[in-house]
Amino acid sequence: MICKTQKLNNGKEIPTVGLGTWGMEDEAVLEGAIRNALSLGYRHIDTAFIYGNEKMIGNILKKLFDEGVVQRKDLFITSKLWNTFHGCPEDGLRRSLNDLQMDYVDLYLIHWPVTFDPAPDGTVESCGKKYNVGKFDAVGVWKKMEALVDLGLAKSIGISNFGKANTEKILGTCRICPAAIQIELHPYLNQKELVEFMKSKGIQVISYSSLGSAPGSSAKVRDDKTIKAIAKKYGCAPSQIILSYITAQGICVIPKSRSKEHLRENIDLKELSREDISAIDALNTGHRYVDPPGFGPEKFK
């Protein structure tokens, strides 16, 4: 049976399945997705400063709080520190909290192990095609992240898109261990070695791009013939097989969907046989759908 929550190393719990919001920039569409998700029992909403939708999410959730649909204490909200705020994570988080209209987030992640120095005009919102990549100081940024927990602005802190090297730098000096890591993970990129390392350190793994696709990409994991054959065997959608495969490993997922039907499918997970899990394991090619150019040599390290 798939557990509904996973316990973090600080004793707090994170829902196994959450709602991803990357790419959702239309407020009406986003509100529909959040309302549908909450009605189905979702309680984790994943966002980030760079997604550009935190203000919309804040407006939507305030409306839902006022309507009595859900209470803040029942939600798990994740946001992420953008690359231009490494010098002052508190500033980055306070901007997100202001937009979200919240006093705290449940999980705050360093979005990338990549630092962007401010633009010549002093702005920090840079996210275009030209990046002013600076030197990433994993230990220094993490110490500032720890202060966010002390201030009560984040219940848990973690990392995203990190590999073993930068994670070990943090673990060697940290006062508060990263509670979670968010990485691209799907049958074509199962990241077995990194997952085992994170588990050995008590760091909860969260998969993004779980269904294996990205804007402009060609081969989608859910169209893979092996995935489709297993889905036919279980009488369900290919996406359900992929999410079942990932969550069976104790990994959280945050699939994005606007459709209530798909949202329902994404929490209706199946118990896969060992044979089917092995068949999906064999699909690993190491293919990344998310590999931003211009992010420098530290990305994924």
Curated annotation (Swiss-Prot):
PROSITE patterns given in the database record: ALDOKETO_REDUCTASE_1, ALDOKETO_REDUCTASE_2
Q: Any idea where this protein resides? A: Cytoplasm
Which transformation does this protein catalyse, written as a reaction? an alditol + NAD(+) = an aldose + NADH + H(+); an alditol + NADP(+) = an aldose + NADPH + H(+)
Positions annotated to bind substrate: H111
Superkingdom, taxonomy of origin: Eukaryota
| Protein keywords | Cytoplasm, NADP, Oxidoreductase
Catalytic site: Y51
Record keywords: Cytoplasm included?
yes
One Pfam family named in its UniProt record = Aldo_ket_red
The EC code for this enzyme is 1.1.1.21
User: What broad class of enzyme is this?
Assistant: oxidoreductase
Q: Which GO MF terms are attached to this record?
A: aldose reductase (NADPH) activity
What residues does NADP(+) bind to?
11-20, 209-266
Identify the CDD domains for this entry.
AKR_AKR1-5-like (cd19071)
Annotated signal peptide: none
Q: Which residues form a coiled coil?
A: none
Q: Name one GO cellular component term.
A: cytoplasm
The family classification in the record reads: Belongs to the aldo/keto reductase family.
What is the documented function of this protein? Catalyzes the NADPH-dependent reduction of a wide variety of carbonyl-containing compounds to their corresponding alcohols with a broad range of catalytic efficiencies.
* Name of the protein this chain belongs to: Aldose reductase
